[in-house]
């Protein structure tokens, strides 16, 4: 059985490809998701995707992953700087996660420099554009441990 990966994208990431392309590029979220699924499959893993602009929906999806997913890749979007609740959900399910940002948040506004996730993430990918998603999928597929069989 291959690894199971959950890719979560937070607020406004549904606008990838059209929102501030000078920062986020021209690739759509649908293209990112399709590319990530194909890459995961090429590595013997499966990948499920989820995007929401709502904090509670993201928390619900994280909680639903408990016992079903080997690793989470999360681009929390603006929730990076505000959501203790999503952080608590990630810690509560005990699934290792990668924090991902398309842009280099440390080269942007000072308020974007703080993350509620970075100190607990297994890894952080910042500023690689949408290529960062491929890097994250590969890392989880090749390096995270599979959950124990029940």
Curated annotation (Swiss-Prot):
It comes from the Eukaryota. The active site is at residues 24, 101. Homododecamer. Adopts a ring-like structure, composed of an arrangement of two hexameric rings stacked on top of one another. Belongs to the type-II 3-dehydroquinase family. PROSITE patterns: DEHYDROQUINASE_II. Pfam families: DHquinase_II. The keyword Lyase applies. Gene3D superfamilies: Dehydroquinase, class II (3.40.50.9100). The gene is qutE1. The record marks 19 as: Transition state stabilizer. InterPro entries: DHquinase_II (IPR001874), DHquinase_II_CS (IPR018509), DHquinase_II_sf (IPR036441). This is Catabolic 3-dehydroquinase 1. GO terms for biological process: 3,4-dihydroxybenzoate biosynthetic process; quinate catabolic process. Keywords: Lyase, Quinate metabolism. One of its GO terms (molecular function) is 3-dehydroquinate dehydratase activity. Pathway: Aromatic compound metabolism; 3,4-dihydroxybenzoate biosynthesis; 3,4-dihydroxybenzoate from 3-dehydroquinate: step 1/2. Its EC number is 4.2.1.10. The keyword Lyase applies. Is involved in the catabolism of quinate. Allows the utilization of quinate as carbon source via the beta-ketoadipate pathway. Substrate binds at residues 75, 81, 88, 102-103, 112. It catalyses: 3-dehydroquinate = 3-dehydroshikimate + H2O.
């Amino acid at each position: 059985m291959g690894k199971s990966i959950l890719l979560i994208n937070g607020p406004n990431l549904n606008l990838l490809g059209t929102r501030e392309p000078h920062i986020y590029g021209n690739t759509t979220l649908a293209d990112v998701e399709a590319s990530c699924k194909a890459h995961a499959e090429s590595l013997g893993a499966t990948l499920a995707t989820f995007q929401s602009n709502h904090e509670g929906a993201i928390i619900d999806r994280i909680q639903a992953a408990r016992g079903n997913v080997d690793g989470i890749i999360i681009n929390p979007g603006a929730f990076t700087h505000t959501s203790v609740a999503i952080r608590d959900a990630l810690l509560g399910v005990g699934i290792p996660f990668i924090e991902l940002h398309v842009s280099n948040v440390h080269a942007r506004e000072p308020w974007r420099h703080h993350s509620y996730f970075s100190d607990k993430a297994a890894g952080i990918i910042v500023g690689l554009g949408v290529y960062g998603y491929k890097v994250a999928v590969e890392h989880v597929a090749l390096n995270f441990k599979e959950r124990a069989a029940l």
